[in-house]
From Swiss-Prot:
Lineage: Eukaryota, Metazoa, Spiralia, Lophotrochozoa, Annelida
Protein name (record): Giant extracellular hemoglobin linker 1 chain
Alphabetic keyword roster: Disulfide bond, Oxygen transport, Transport
Family matches, as PROSITE patterns: LDLRA_1, LDLRA_2
Signal peptide: none
Cystine bridges: C91-C105, C98-C118, C112-C129
Xref: Gene3D superfamilies: 2.40.128.620
Presence of the UniProt keyword Disulfide bond in the record: yes
SUPFAM superfamilies, alphabetized: Extracellular hemoglobin linker subunit, receptor domain, LDL receptor-like module
């Protein structure tokens, strides 16, 4: 027949095409020609480079989106807290608000004790029971108002958290150790002093409380806003509660 004889041999009028690798009728691969091969490799390399750039751009867009999403969520939480604070359903200073529809308040000593006393669990959730100033945290502030509290009259005040211990028998009041560094100026000369102090952390008010080892019985408190672990309002007061100095501190670690 036209396609073959009885022995299976091809009786085609045309030879079978060769050169499946781009060599045409010669049967040679295109890569056998160094000039063609180099050109194609260079073209592939350029395409891969373009793809890598596109992937990098997409990664940057994704990172920016995630960062923006986190910032928006924190901003929303801050606004929510501000609105809550303006409404007339506050708990007194010795209680924590459960922030529920019933406006429930629970005692300060029940916050972060390992048992849920708020029906919504707000007193034991991660946000409430996280310590804003962990070990190694360092905060510094400038004192620009008249200091009627201290003997040293510092112009700069820094505290560094050196240890936090959460007692098993009373976890709602972690013990804190810190170092206080003060810079003072007198007669044009700067002096620095340091104090090792003990204190506690107050979950209800997000507050570090440090007690002076001196005989002046001063108490230093630094209160963190909700959703902000980088700034705190510093207050120096006498053991009787009278405030004699206020200033703002910022995280520097």
């Amino acid at each position: 027949g036209a396609l073959g004889d009885r022995n299976g041999d091809c009786a085609c009028d045309r030879p079978s095409p060769r050169g499946y690798w781009g060599g045409g009728m010669t049967g040679r691969s295109a890569f056998a020609d160094p000039h063609i091969a180099e050109g194609r490799l260079a073209n592939q390399d350029a395409r891969l480079g373009t793809l890598e750039e596109e992937v990098d751009k997409l990664q940057h867009k994704y990172d920016d989106f995630i960062a923006g999403k986190t910032a928006r969520r924190e901003r929303f939480a801050q606004l929510k807290d501000r609105v809550w604070g303006l409404e007339a359903h506050h708990c007194d200073d010795d209680h924590l608000s459960c922030k529920d529809v019933a406006f429930t308040c629970i005692g300060h000593n029940l916050v972060c004790d390992g048992h849920k006393d708020c029906l919504n669990g707000h007193d034991e959730d991660e946000e409430t029971c996280s310590i804003a100033a962990s070990v190694g945290s360092s905060f510094e502030g400038q004192i620009r108002q008249l200091d009627t509290c201290t003997k040293r009259k510092p112009s700069a005040f820094r505290f560094i958290i050196t240890n936090v211990d959460v007692p098993k028998y009373f976890p709602q009041e972690p013990h804190v150790k810190a170092t206080i560094l003060m810079t003072s100026s007198k007669d044009g000369h700067e002096t620095q002093s340091s104090l090792a102090v003990d204190g506690v952390y107050d979950f209800t008010h997000r507050k570090v409380i440090l007690y002076s080892p001196d005989k002046d019985n001063l108490i230093f408190e630094c209160t963190f806003p909700r959703h902000d672990n980088n700034h705190c309002k510093g207050v120096m007061k006498h053991s009787g509660g009278d405030v004699c100095l206020t200033f703002t501190l910022e995280r520097i670690d």
